[in-house]
Amino acid sequence: MAREYPLERYRNFGIMAHIDAGKTTTTERILFYTGKNHKMGETHEGASTMDWMEQEAERGITITSAATTTFWQRHEDADFTPDDSERCRFNIIDTPGHVDFTIEVERSLAVLDGAICLLDGNAGVEPQTETVWRQADRYKVPRIVFVNKMDKIGADFFKCVAMIKDRTGGTPCPIALPIGAEDKLEGIVDLIKMEEWVWKGEDLGASWVRQPIRDELQDVAEEWRGKMIELAVEQDDEAMEAYLDGNEPDEATLRKLIRKGTLSLSFFPVMAGSAFKNKGVQPLLNAVVDFLPAPTDVPAYLGFAPGDETETRNIERSASDDQPFSALAFKIMNDPFVGSLTFTRIYSGQLKKGDQMLNATKGKRERVGRMMVMHAINREEIEEAFAGEIIALAGLKETTTGDTLCDPAKPVVLETMTFPEPVIEIAVEPKSKADQEKMGLALQRLAAEDPSFRVETDMESGQTIMKGMGELHLDILVDRMKREFKVEANIGAPQVAYRETISQPAEIDYTHKKQTGGTGQFARVKLQIEPTEPGEGYSFESKIVGGAVPKEYIPGVEKGIKSVMDSGPLAGFPVIDFKVALIDGAFHDVDSSVLAFEIAARAGMREGLKKAGAKLLEPIMRVEVVTPEEYTGSIIGDLTSRRGMVRGQDTRGNANVIDAFVPLANMFGYINNLRSMSSGRAVFTMQFDHYEAVPQNISDEIQKKYA
């Protein structure tokens, strides 16, 4: 089976939005109109419409699938003639609603070619919009802005356009204006064709009328068309010269120039409408075809050879079926019917059912079993897939989020996702016996989906411990456990994952001797303990010469040392960053054993750690606060009061960026403080950076607490 659609007619895009901007409704409308468009030839319009919506409501499409494939033929008249040679294939990728998870956002941005950014017509650019926008800037993702909810009281399109400029630093380029607002919203003015699109019928927005622009809107339309053309002609010297000579570009040239400016991120086309009132969605879909990139418009992907520690990116993969197969697994989801599904973006080459793939990240082979494409309301089993496609693979055993899959003969690693160690933990207990069974399964599935989340059992208390990257991270996982898996649980207060280490070298000579009649126990060890550089971890070596300790007893010595590492002498936290050498010892022909040397090493290490100046370490977070300038002073003062160290300031667009190191212990509840200090306009991201010694007065308090 050959490729059904040429790569130029693919659009892989996501919908980015602040939490209440109407993402679900917009996605539902897109799926409704594209689905109807797909079946328009064979189903009577009225008959399919309502079933489709009911089915969609039942199945919760926008929630259950990480990527949905659907189809759209660009058209301007409601009663157009379907033509397969004109149809585009849309892969709509679900971008996470919560932007605090850098890992979640980065992995979805890695597979997007373009995006629709939704704004609430009343609220405009909100804090979370700014955060997603910045991350999309970093990944150079072209965007179209859709000012949604224009039917809402207080909706103001022009205020939203100004906010894009002020708050993101990006250049907005309106290509459509709303006709009316609030309950008088009728449709849009298309500034490229200079005509109105008006929706009047009661058919869920399936039909509209194109008509000349009414007199009272003519002046404002001319003004904004002029601004649009000025931005567009900057993309091409010839067009600019012609425009300065009084010649406006024709419609086809104008679309080409707007496309060029969008792809180069010179500006962002802005449109308007109301998904809830079914107005403005079809022109938005046409704009996806006209202005968002196909996989062929995206620069070639550079990867490195598996095992290359320098990660030199010199292996090129571009969107072509003729290149070796390469793909990125970007999301693991559990499907009630199929089991574990690995959502995968194919960057280059082809994949057939039964093929062997190499998981280049892990060095393991996987066989392609079931392959499917997720359509809005069903999954379609496929036999092969091509570059630019987004598919789901069932039953992969070794693959997790962020892994590269490739041709075993031409290996490449596309992405490296390093998942930092968790820095915060909470104890979680099921409320009932029924919850207990469900909780185990829920935690297992959540951990499979999110590599930055860990679950462990506390050996002493038997409690289940959830570990993650921050307070919000764990809050949301607990919420998902409740919503998706119906597990009710009691949650403990968050705890910081402290560590212990040593500050100076020490030598310890310890003898273990026990006589109880019959065979006794005897072992003597002389240990040299030294601190290592932060992050170097633990190492052990034997420097025994002349058989002072026989070889067969040395594993017992190391086992004894390791048994002390899990619980340090100060407050029982894991001990890190030290090395131990066994430099001397003694044994007894009859009374010595592996166990005797293990006991001697354990007791010797306990003494040695105290002698070597044990100290407590705490996780230090790298905190980035993005804030309007007027709040900078109070935010810096607050960070300093939290034992923070401000490393620098920068400007980004019209905002100030504060970069600081702050102990995690002082960041609990920070989000609420920041909101009240900045009237909700400042946002922050936080990630673990390093461990650092705890000041003595605070260390004393922690030791008392855990004694």
Curated annotation (Swiss-Prot):
NCBIfam families referenced in this protein's UniProt entry, alphabetically:
EF-G, PRK12740.1-5, small_GTP
Keywords tagged on the record: Cytoplasm, Elongation factor, GTP-binding, Nucleotide-binding, Protein biosynthesis
Provide the tr-type G domain boundaries. 8-296
Matching CDD domains: EF-G, EFG_III, EFG_mtEFG1_IV, EFG_mtEFG_C, EFG_mtEFG_II
State the family it belongs to.
Belongs to the TRAFAC class translation factor GTPase superfamily. Classic translation factor GTPase family. EF-G/EF-2 subfamily.
Q: Cross-referenced Gene3D superfamilies, in alphabetical order?
A: 3.30.230.10, 3.30.70.240, Elongation Factor G (Translational Gtpase), domain 3, P-loop containing nucleotide triphosphate hydrolases, Translation factors
According to its UniProt entry, what is the function of this protein? Catalyzes the GTP-dependent ribosomal translocation step during translation elongation. During this step, the ribosome changes from the pre-translocational (PRE) to the post-translocational (POST) state as the newly formed A-site-bound peptidyl-tRNA and P-site-bound deacylated tRNA move to the P and E sites, respectively. Catalyzes the coordinated movement of the two tRNA molecules, the mRNA and conformational changes in the ribosome.
Tell me what gene encodes this.
Answer: fusA
Which SMART domains does UniProt cross-reference here?
EFG_C (SM00838), EFG_IV (SM00889)
Listed under GO biological process in this entry are: ribosome disassembly
Descriptive protein name: Elongation factor G
Location relative to the cell: Cytoplasm
The record, for SUPFAM superfamilies, names: EF-G C-terminal domain-like (SSF54980), P-loop containing nucleoside triphosphate hydrolases (SSF52540), Ribosomal protein S5 domain 2-like (SSF54211), Translation proteins (SSF50447)
Its cellular-component GO annotations read: cytoplasm
Organism, as annotated: Paracoccus denitrificans (strain Pd 1222)
Q: Where, if anywhere, are coiled coils annotated?
A: none
Q: Which cysteines are joined by disulfide bonds?
A: none
Q: What does the record give under GO molecular function?
A: GTP binding; GTPase activity; translation elongation factor activity
